[in-house]
Amino acid sequence: MAEQARQMDFAYSRVARHQPNIALTDRIATLSGPGYERVALSSGGSEAMEIAIKFVRQYFVATGQPERRHLLTCQPSYHGSTIATLGMSGDEALGDFFDGFGMTSHKVPAPLTYRLPKPHTPESYANFALDALEAKIQELGPNTVLAFAMEPVGGLATGCTVPLPAYFEGIREICSRHRIFLIFDEVLCGTGRTGKFLNAHYYPDALPDIVV
């Protein structure tokens, strides 16, 4: 810690960078591989999710698409503990708390793989979840949607469930077709926790646009 303190200068990140920041982000970008050359650091997962949404919103405003303001997430899901990320999370217990308060997202079924409604199998439920995602996009209007954020390994809300590979390919196709950002929330499963540095690396044909 003393050595780090001797190296690290204070610099407001929107104005300048310091050498430890440069070294760390370069290392993360190298491990993340092609397509993930840009890195933004945050103090935790909740803030990181908000940074991702702010980035996507800024992109669409800058490219003349300010009408894109809807965010899609899964039910159930968990994306953080701030007002914004709780609103993004799919937890029915929060319904009375929010009731129009804060930032909320439109929910679609999570691609669960166990304890499924009969007569579903993991394969049929994955297709059901994909159909629901497409239907919600059409309901809102494809040109009004910012992004679809999901957990490639379910966390607090779903008990570490892992969707089928075909589901990832399906959401990638849907998001690409509608020019919607696909965001993987890897706060639980990223940085080597499942073997590869990014869990997204298990799905080379369905890589997300942003990994948190």
Short names for language-model regions:
Residues 1-212:
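Conserved N-terminal phosphate-binding loop of PLP-dependent enzymes in the Aspartate aminotransferase
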